[in-house]
Amino acid sequence: LNRGVNSLGFVLNGCQEFTKADMEVLLKDICLECVEINFVAGCKKGSILDAFKAVVEERGIAPEKIQGGINVDPLTALTRKGKNCCDKPFENVKVNLEKMAAYKNFKTIEVGGYVFNNSGSSIVQELGFSLAAGVEYLDKLTDAGMKIDEVAPKIRFHFATGSKYFMEIAKLRAARYLWAHIV
C-alpha cells in the first residue's frame, strides 16, 4: 500500500452476514481517504455497506473523502444466472443507494457490461446492452421516487476489454459520450 497502490478490491463471496468487526479486520492499517475501496460481494451487500459505514464513522472520516464502490447489479445477476438472490432486487438497490447517499464518490450501482462480452456479444452490442441496463436502473429508481441526479452519479460501468485495442478505446470513449447524453 505504501508503494503506489491507489485502489483495492475485496471479493467477499457467500451469503453470510458481514459485521463491523469483520470490516475492521479487513480494513486494518488501510488509509481509507487515500485508497479507493471496492467490494465484489454475494447476497449480503447491505450488511457490507453497514459495516463499512460504521468503520468510516468510527474513524471520523468525512463521507465525501471516501472513494470506491460495490457491485450492486441485479440485472447482471439475472443475465448470468436467470435469478436474483432476493425477491425485490430494485428495492435493495434503492435502499443501498439511500444508505450511501452522503458518500458522493462511492458508487453503489454497477452495470456489468463484461457479461455481454463474455457471452459472445460484439463491442457494439456490449455497449448497447450496457447502456440499456444503465437506463433500466434509472427508470426503475426514478419510478420508485428517486431523482435522476441522485441515481446517475452512483452508477458505474464495468466493461470487458479485448485485443482489438483501438476498438476497445473507441468503445470506452463512446460509452462516456453516450452516457453523458442519456443523463
Name each region found by the language model.
Residues 1-164:
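Catalytic alpha/beta active-site cores
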Residues 131, 157-183:
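Glycine-rich anion/phosphate-binding loop at the beta-strand->alpha-helix junction
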